[in-house]
C-alpha cells in the first residue's frame, strides 16, 4: 500500500496518487487528488470523470463459446458438475487484458477428472489472463472437453442475443467494464473569496488495468469528446483560411491496395492494427468509432469516406497519409504505381 499526505496548495493545478493498493488479483484500488480548484469546479470534474470511468473505459472479455454435442444452453453434460449455463457464466467472469482490437480465438481442451480454471485457457500472446485461478468447471469423470472461445475488446455491457445460438455455439453477455466502482468527494478550505476545493477520486478496477491507467484513459476520452467544440470555434473565426486548407490532393487507399497486397510479405493486413502506428489519440479514436481497427479496414476507405466521419478534420487525413507512408511504405499521393 502507498500513501501520501494531502496538503492544500495555492500553486498551479496538479494531481497525484495519494493511495494505491492491490487487494487481490482482481481488485485494485487507487485514490487521487486534484487541487487547487475554484468553488464548484471539483463537482463538475468529479461527475464527468466518474461517468467516463464507469462507461467509457474499454475492456477485453470472452464473447462466445462453442462445443460439440451440446443440445442447448440449459442442458447438462455427463461427467461435468456444472450445467452448460453455469459454465457460460463462469466464462463471462474471466478477467482478461489486451490492447488489440478485433476478434481473437482461444480454446480449452482437457481430459477429466480435472478442476478446470482460467489457467487451462489456451490464448494468443496478445491476450493475458489476469487471474489464472478463476473457476470454469469441474470434470468428475474421465471425459474429454473441448471449448472454442472468441475474445473481443469492447466497451460497456451488452446482453447476448437469444437468436444468436446455433450448432453448439453460444454467445456470452459482453461485460467490458474494467472499472468496478468509482467515487468522488470534495474537501473545501480557505475563507471568503479565497475558498478553494480539493477533489478526491477513488477507483476500483478488476485488475485488467490499474486505477491510474483507468484515470488516464477516462481523462483522454473526455478530452477527445470536447475537442470538436474548440475546432468548431476556430473554423467559424477563420472560415476563409480553413477553406484553403481543405484542398488536399484527392487520393484513394484502393489505388495502392492491390499493388501493396502483392508486394507485402509476412503479416496479413487484418493483423496490422491501427494502434500499432503513431496516430494521435484524437485521430485514433475517430477511426475506432467508425469501426476502423486494422490496416485492411483503413485501406478500404477513400479521403471522402474519412472526411464524412464525425469530428474528422483535414489535419487528421494528413496525419494518416504521413503515418501510413512512414510505417507501411505506401506512397498514397503518387499517381504512379
Curated annotation (Swiss-Prot):
It is an enzyme of class 2 (transferase). The keyword Thylakoid does not apply. The N-terminal domain is essential for RNAP assembly and basal transcription, whereas the C-terminal domain is involved in interaction with transcriptional regulators and with upstream promoter elements. Residues 265-337 are annotated as: Alpha C-terminal domain (alpha-CTD). In plastids the minimal PEP RNA polymerase catalytic core is composed of four subunits: alpha, beta, beta', and beta''. When a (nuclear-encoded) sigma factor is associated with the core the holoenzyme is formed, which can initiate transcription. This is DNA-directed RNA polymerase subunit alpha. Keywords: Chloroplast, DNA-directed RNA polymerase, Nucleotidyltransferase, Plastid, Transcription, Transferase. One of its GO terms (molecular function) is DNA-directed RNA polymerase activity. Belongs to the RNA polymerase alpha chain family. It catalyses: RNA(n) + a ribonucleoside 5'-triphosphate = RNA(n+1) + diphosphate. Pfam families: RNA_pol_A_bac (PF01000), RNA_pol_A_CTD (PF03118), RNA_pol_L (PF01193). InterPro entries: DNA-dir_RNA_pol_insert, DNA-dir_RNA_pol_RpoA/D/Rpb3, DNA-dir_RpoA, RBP11-like, RNAP_asu_C, RNApol_insert_sf. The keyword Nucleotidyltransferase applies. Its EC number is 2.7.7.6. One of its GO terms (cellular component) is mitochondrion. One of its GO terms (biological process) is DNA-templated transcription. Its main location: plastid. DNA-dependent RNA polymerase catalyzes the transcription of DNA into RNA using the four ribonucleoside triphosphates as substrates. It is found in: Plastid, Chloroplast.
Amino acid at each position: 500500500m502507498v500513501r501520501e499526505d494531502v496538503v492544500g496548495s495555492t500553486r498551479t493545478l496538479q494531481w497525484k496518487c495519494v493511495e494505491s493498493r492491490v487487494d487481490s488479483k482482481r481488485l485494485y484500488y487507487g485514490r487521487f487528488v486534484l487541487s487547487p480548484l475554484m468553488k464548484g469546479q471539483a463537482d463538475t470534474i468529479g461527475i464527468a470523470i466518474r461517468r467516463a470511468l464507469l462507461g467509457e473505459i474499454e475492456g477485453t472479455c470472452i464473447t462466445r463459446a462453442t462445443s460439440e454435442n451440446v443440445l442447448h444452453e440449459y442442458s447438462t453434460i455427463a461427467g461435468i458438475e456444472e450445467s452448460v449455463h453455469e459454465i457460460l457464466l463462469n466464462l463471462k467472469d474471466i478477467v482478461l487484458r489486451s490492447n488489440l482490437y478485433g476478434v481473437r480465438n482461444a480454446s480449452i481442451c482437457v481430459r477429466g477428472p480435472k478442476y478446470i480454471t482460467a489457467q487451462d485457457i489456451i490464448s494468443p500472446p496478445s491476450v493475458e489472463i489476469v487471474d489464472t485461478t478463476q473457476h470454469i468447471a469441474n470434470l468428475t469423470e474421465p471425459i474429454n472437453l473441448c471449448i472454442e472461445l472468441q475474445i473481443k475488446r469492447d466497451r460497456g455491457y451488452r446482453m447476448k442475443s437469444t437468436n444468436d445460438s446455433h450448432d453448439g455455439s453460444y454467445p456470452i453477455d459482453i461485460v467490458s467494464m474494467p472499472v468496478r466502482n468509482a467515487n468522488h468527494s470534495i474537501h473545501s478550505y480557505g475563507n471568503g473569496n479565497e475558498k478553494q476545493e480539493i477533489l478526491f477520486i477513488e477507483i476500483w478496477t478488476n485488475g485488467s488495468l490499474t486505477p491510474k491507467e483507468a484515470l488516464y484513459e477516462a481523462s483522454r476520452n473526455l478530452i477527445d469528446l470536447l475537442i470538436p467544440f474548440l475546432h468548431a470555434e476556430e473554423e467559424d473565426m477563420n472560415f476563409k483560411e480553413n477553406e484553403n486548407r481543405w484542398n488536399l490532393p484527392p487520393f484513394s487507399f484502393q489505388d495502392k491496395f492491390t499493388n501493396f497486397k502483392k508486394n507485402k510479405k509476412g503479416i496479413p493486413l487484418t493483423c496490422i492494427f491501427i494502434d500499432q502506428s503513431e496516430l494521435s489519440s484524437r485521430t485514433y479514436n475517430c477511426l475506432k468509432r467508425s469501426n476502423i481497427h486494422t490496416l485492411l479496414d483503413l485501406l478500404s476507405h477513400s479521403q471522402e469516406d474519412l472526411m464524412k466521419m464525425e469530428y474528422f478534420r483535414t489535419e487528421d487525413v494528413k496525419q494518416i497519409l504521413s503515418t501510413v507512408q512512414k510505417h507501411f511504405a505506401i506512397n498514397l499521393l503518387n499517381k504512379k504505381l
